[in-house]
């Protein structure tokens, strides 16, 4: 029996690939099985000191993602003997990665793209896994797609179950069990009852926080002693009737040396403008994201303490300033440009390759693997979903051969 903990980019693809290969697979998900449109109800809460965007439900963070699909950390992973070239090609074809048709590039996004190019910045459409034929361009990607037009880990879990896998939802895995240095099962809690499930192999794909807590309780004291979370702010301002709030979000991309920019609506920008006549349809805003240093840790109760370095702050400031130039070039009133608070979107690096896992994502406990953003050695500074999918495909192929 192979037990997979979590149903996001890592767990979902692993479950699909292994179940289709005829392997006996049981998937455990801490959250419920939901309709995608209800995903906004399942964002996690952390301490007031950290604003971190994660979810606990079927599909994990993928169900509220923008379905952005970019390759990241290729060279860094190669240093650990991890070549994802073939895996990338497989998953890109599987989920349909492509740049959106012009029919799904709205006025605000086009203004962003035009401004970036006029300023000589490295500007392109964002690769995504969205089906234009189904997408209604509502702007609600981050709340859960109301028409299931974008890929999420839920899709792969459904495939796995159809192929014979067992799915147990609302089941919190608390510990991995081992004997003589080898996996023998897991403990989990469902309906307030502790259960034991025997397993020959266990793969933790519960996200950087969830997997870390399980590792800690399973004897890995070093897990969670460092963390990145791809910090971001949104910078925006007033441009009458741009209607950007109903566009497909993050459909454009500007790649800087130390940051990336992508058009992303934030209602918090409107609150910064002292004019009651300004509404959401009058806001154009840009997400500024950087690759932060892995300074911080995960506490034993699952809270996150993040330490911002001078470089973290410097690069975010550089990106925010560039976003201001792009917005002004795009037609935004410069007197209205403001920023949101600092937040984090992609926690990871809590069980990195080379420290907690080896190049096959296996821990010191035989047949215990980790496959999610936890294993990334450094912050990608850009959406990590495609990289996690590729790591998952590579691990699935490795396990099929055993």
Protein language model annotation of sequence segments:
Residues 1-78, 188, 222-237:
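N-terminal glycine-rich phosphate/pyrophosphate-binding loop and immediately adjacent elements
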Residues 61, 220-321, 325, 364, ...:
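FAD cofactor-binding and catalytic pocket of flavoenzymes
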Residues 63-64, 68-136:
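Rossmann-like flavin
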Residues 94-99, 123-163, 302-308:
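Helix-loop-beta segment of a Rossmann-like dinucleotide-binding subdomain
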Residues 136-195, 200:
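Helical element adjacent to the flavin cofactor pocket in flavoenzyme catalytic cores
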Residues 386-401:
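An active-site-proximal "capping" alpha-helix that borders the catalytic cofactor pocket
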């Amino acid at each position: 029996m192979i037990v997979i903990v979590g149903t996001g980019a890592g767990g979902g693809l692993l479950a699909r690939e292994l179940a289709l290969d005829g392997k006996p697979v049981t998937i455990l998900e801490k959250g419920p099985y939901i309709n995608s449109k209800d995903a906004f109800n399942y964002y996690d809460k952390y301490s007031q000191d950290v604003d971190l965007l994660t979810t606990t439900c079927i599909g994990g963070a993928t169900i509220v993602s923008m379905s952005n699909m970019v390759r990241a950390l290729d060279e860094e992973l190669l240093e650990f003997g991890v070549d994802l070239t073939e895996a990338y090609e497989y998953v890109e074809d599987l989920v349909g990665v492509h740049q959106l048709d012009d029919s799904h590039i709205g006025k605000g996004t086009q203004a962003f793209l035009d401004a970036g190019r006029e300023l000589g910045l490295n500007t392109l459409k964002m690769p995504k896994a969205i089906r234009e034929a189904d997408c209604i361009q509502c702007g609600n990607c981050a709340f859960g797609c109301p028409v299931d037009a974008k890929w999420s880990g839920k899709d792969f879990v459904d495939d796995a179950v159809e192929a014979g896998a067992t799915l147990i939802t609302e089941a919190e895995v608390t510990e991995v069990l081992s004997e003589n240095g080898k996996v023998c099962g897991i403990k989990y809690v469902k309906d307030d009852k502790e259960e034991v499930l025997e397993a020959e192999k266990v793969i933790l794909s519960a996200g950087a926080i969830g997997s870390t807590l399980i590792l800690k309780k399973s004897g890995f004291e070093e897990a969670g002693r460092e963390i990145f979370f791809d910090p971001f702010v949104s910078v925006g301002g007033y441009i009458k009737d741009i209607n950007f709030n109903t566009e497909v979000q993050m459909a454009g991309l500007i790649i800087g040396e130390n940051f990336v920019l992508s058009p992303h609506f934030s209602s918090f920008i409107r609150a910064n403008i002292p004019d009651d006549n300004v509404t959401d349809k009058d806001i154009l805003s840009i997400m500024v994201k950087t690759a932060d240093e892995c300074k911080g840790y995960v506490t034993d109760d699952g809270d996150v303490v993040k330490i911002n370095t001078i470089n973290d702050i410097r690069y975010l400031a550089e990106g925010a300033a560039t976003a201001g130039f792009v917005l002004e070039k795009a037609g935004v009133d410069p007197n209205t440009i403001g920023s949101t608070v600092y937040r984090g979107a992609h926690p990871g690096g809590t069980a990195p390759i080379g420290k907690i896992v080896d190049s096959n994502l296996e821990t010191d406990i035989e047949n215990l693997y980790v496959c999610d953003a936890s294993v990334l050695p450094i912050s990608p500074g850009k959406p990590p979903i495609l990289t996690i999918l590729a790591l998952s495909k590579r691990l699935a192929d490795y396990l099929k051969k055993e």
